[in-house]
Amino acid sequence: MTDGILGKAATMEIPIHGNGEAGQLPEDDGLEQDLQQVMVSGPNLNETSIVSGGYGGSGDGLIPTGSGRHPSHSATPAGPGDEVARGIAGEKFDIVKKWGINTYKCTKQLLSERFGRGSRTVDLELELQIELLRETKRKYESVLQLGRALTAHLYSLLQTQHALGDAFADLSQKSPELQEEFGYNAETQKLLCKNGETLLGAVNFFVSSINTLVTKTMEDTLMTVKQYEAARLEYDAYRTDLEELSLGPRDAGTRGRLESAQATFQAHRDKYEKLRGDVAIKLKFLEENKIKVMHKQLLLFHNAVSAYFAGNQKQLEQTLQQFNIKLRPPGAEKPSWLEEQ
């Protein structure tokens, strides 16, 4: 009866083909790749031996894998170096073993959730905030893309106006009868170029600040969110495992397993609750920082664009001074994003 209950508790709900093999699921490829990556970093077996006869094989089934070329005529007692190598190999094996068990439990929990056969822990308020953050990030990325496009168009316009101003100035010297007309058109284009460079500096500052907010501040919070979601999956996986063991018989063998499962579950629960608190704090700080940054940047963008199209050069320059924006001279190296803040 004990074997039947334990076998039922360890059963994973995966479709089986007619030949008795487990059905391939979309998650199988990713799991196989993860296994390959872990095994690559496994213990170094260059100075160990491989048993070719399977479990319980005789000593004749040992295949030496060392680099020695001369046959050994007598057994050599193991030295301190061999003990250290075995200890390292054992530690690596334990790491791979724990990773494999954890991956199996998490994959089982994930599949159960996908197919509606298992329960998951849900913090509705926190998950709503996380989804809102992801949606906000997508919208800000769109604003960032449009801001970069505007910067490219303004730069192209400045190049055209500069070339047009030079052409007018050259023609004013070579056409005495139209010298005055070409002259004031050349001055107008030069003034537009100057104001355009000021506007371009303001827009560049706006784009740089949005880029920092999206790719650094929001991304940092989302990295913590990913860690929280992984911890939630592990927590639910070990919670389910503990519940299955609790429903089984209470003999001497299962009692030890139950205590071990309880300790492991508590460790994952503490990790989950800690990361949940970290996410809540980061979301709060992110919202405050976003409002502060965007209030400043939207005011800058509005004042600069309004002054430029109104032809108010003085107000345009005052806007840059108000936000401590310094225009870079032609050919100067671009400052880092920290210097631009």
UniProtKB/Swiss-Prot annotation:
Phosphoserine: residues carrying this PTM: 72
Phosphoprotein in keyword set: yes
CC terms in the record's Gene Ontology section: trans-Golgi network membrane
GO process annotations (BP): intracellular protein transport; mitophagy; protein localization to phagophore assembly site; regulation of Arp2/3 complex-mediated actin nucleation
Database matches in CDD domains: BAR_Arfaptin
Domain AH: 121-321
GO molecular function, one term: phospholipid binding
Keywords: Autophagy, Golgi apparatus, Membrane, Phosphoprotein
Chief location category: Golgi
Compartments where located: Golgi apparatus; Golgi apparatus, trans-Golgi network membrane
Domain of life: Eukaryota
Modified-residue entries (Phosphothreonine), positions: 76
Region called Disordered, residue ranges: 46-83
Subunit and interaction comment: Forms homodimers or heterodimers with ARFIP1. Interacts with RAC1. Specifically binds to GTP-bound ARF1 and ARF6, but binds to RAC1.GTP and RAC1.GDP with similar affinities. Interacts with ARL1. Interacts (via N-terminus) with IKBKB and IKBKG; these interactions inhibit activation of NF-kappa-B.
Function of the molecule: Plays a role in constitutive metalloproteinase (MMP) secretion from the trans Golgi network. May have important functions during vesicle biogenesis at certain cargo subdomains, which could be predominantly utilized by secreted MMPs, such as MMP7 and MMP2. Also involved in autophagy by regulating the starvation-dependent trafficking of ATG9A vesicles which deliver the phosphatidylinositol 4-kinase beta (PI4KB) to the autophagosome initiation site. Involved in phagophore growth during mitophagy by regulating ATG9A trafficking to mitochondria.
Name of the molecule in the record: Arfaptin-2
Gene name in the database record: ARFIP2
